Each structure stands twice: as structure tokens, then as C-alpha cells.
Amino acid sequence: FVAKMDGKIVGHFLFSQFPLSPNADGGHADDSDIVMLAPVSVHADYFHKHIGITMLTLGIQKVREMGYKGITVEGDFNFYNRVGFRTSSEYGIYPTSGYPMTEPRCMMCQETEEGSLKGYGGYVVYDMYYNA
């Protein structure tokens, strides 16, 4: 997804399907109805103009329309909670071992519909970075 103003790209973000593993060591995981949001960027000349919030609001709506159950993100809790993200441990979702979180709130998750993550849980599998 990209945001444009006056024909210039001023921001972008990406959703990728990230499977959950039932154990902290990763390994084989079933396909998931959950996507990860990353990266997100806004051009410095356009900071504090609500571009990030607007982009994410539209993107989250698109993820809902596509039928995904939830979205994970790693980042600034104070920013992402403004668009509905909560600490992922509230949903039983954690990073895999080998990727320690210095601030536990930086791993966040959002349901696409009330209760859509009920019964989900596990560890985000980062293996796709190494197998790309």
C-alpha cells in the first residue's frame, strides 16, 4: 500500500502472511489467518499530518475485507495502540525464541472482528526471512 500527495509517494506499508507455530522453537507451522504489518514508513516532510494513521486505518479495513482474523505488528506501542493494537500476549501470541523482546508491549496484535482471534495462539514464525 502507498500513500500519495500531489503525485508524490509520502508513505507506504506492507502486510505479509506470517504463520503461527505451536511452540517457541518455531519449525513447521500451519497456515495462518493472521498477517503481519511491516514495514511502515512516512516521509519525514509529512510527519504529524496523520498520514500514518490514515494509511493504517484503510489497510486494516482491507485486511478485514479479505477475511483475515488478525494482524500482528512490532513497534511503538504508543503509536500502534492508537489504531487498535494491543499487546499480543493478551491473545496468546508471542515471538519465537531467539527473538527476545526488550519491551514486551512492542509485539502487538489486533482482531479484525470482535472475538476473531478466540482460539488462536502460538508463536510468530520468522523463518520466511531466512528462506526468501
Regions found by a protein language model. Name each.
Residues 6-7, 45, 111-116:
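Short loop segments at secondary-structure junctions
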Residues 31-34, 101-102:
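A short, structural micro-pattern
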Residues 65-69, 75-102:
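Conserved active-site alpha-helix within GNAT-family acetyltransferase domains
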Residues 37, 42, 48-61, 72-73:
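Conserved acetyl-CoA-binding loop-helix of GNAT-fold acetyltransferases
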Residues 15-16, 55-59, 89-94:
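Short acidic (Asp/Glu) patches
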Residues 2, 7-26, 33-41:
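Conserved beta-strand in the GNAT
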Residues 94-132:
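C-terminal "cap" of GNAT-fold acetyltransferases
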